[in-house]
Amino acid sequence: MDTINHYVGMYPIAAGGVIERAFSPFLISMLGVMVIGFACSQRPLRVGIMGVGFAAIIGWMGMTFFSAGGLKYQNTGYVESLITSMDQEAGSEEAEPEPTGIVARLKAEMAAVEARERGETAAPAAKDRSQSSAKTDYINSLRVTYQKDRERRGTNAVPEWDGSGHQVLLWHYEKSLGRYFNNPVEIRPLVSAMNIASYVVFFGIIAAMLVLLFGALRGKGPFFWLLAAVPALLPVFFIIDYSAWLWWYGHRLNDMGAFSVKPFMPTVFGDGKVAQFSTHSYPYWGFGVMLVLSVVIALMVVLRRKQLNRSAGG
């Protein structure tokens, strides 16, 4: 997909949704705490659950982004996605990096298929490693690639590896932007803006938690109903964010692309066309899960309103 994108001057897929992907574990956990808090009818229990839950998320988020080696607190899928993107870039590196977990598994599977076609019995495959072990391998692979990049570009351009989520986020974003159109004059402002955005989102989440705790303490009013409204509207927020990034891709075209096309808005859902390339964009089952949860939360809102009305009437 990225190969097609760069022909028309679009940035790689890894250049989009950078903040959203990095903060998604904490945001989803936060939404879960909000729903649980909204379901609690007793105020002390509600405030206690939300206070403990939010404090744990803040600690987890802070350790992930700003502590040395904090990347290990991210989920395996996120770290694996970084590795997948770096594997796609391997062809442009001077020295081929060590095979990652994904590449090793693919090579093993291909070898097994070839052995079966020849009528041979493939050697027993090793048992799948645990997610924590795989994540450690992914992080080590990122560290090796980071250090090679530091040796190539110089210690002034690339700081020493500390393994924090914040450092890896910005470095990987810069590498993604420069995969096909390596123009530092264009890339540096984008990386700087993403750095500011990461701090804004980090402290914005903390501020939002304080507001929600205030609403939970009151047990009524608009801040209280946000506990259910925000999770229920998650599919809407997803479509807005997804559409915004599609707009960004279509309006941030690089002049170094092989084809010259006018800025465009890619099709959000359905089939579309960019130059002579066809596009297909359809929701996956995860979007269906969000819709189901929205309906469930809407029913919770109706029941809670009836409960509050009965309490007020009594």
Cite the ranges covered by each PLM segment.
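Hydrophobic alpha-helical transmembrane segments
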Residues: E20-F38, N195-L213, G288-V296
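Short, low-complexity cationic-aromatic patches
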Residues: F23-P25, V47-V52, S278-W285
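Membrane-water interface of alpha-helical transmembrane segments
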Residues: S192-S198, R218-A228, F277-F287
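Long, compositionally biased interface segments
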Residues: G270-G314
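Long, glycine/tryptophan/cysteine-rich extracytoplasmic
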Residues: M1-R21, F66-M194, Y242-Y284
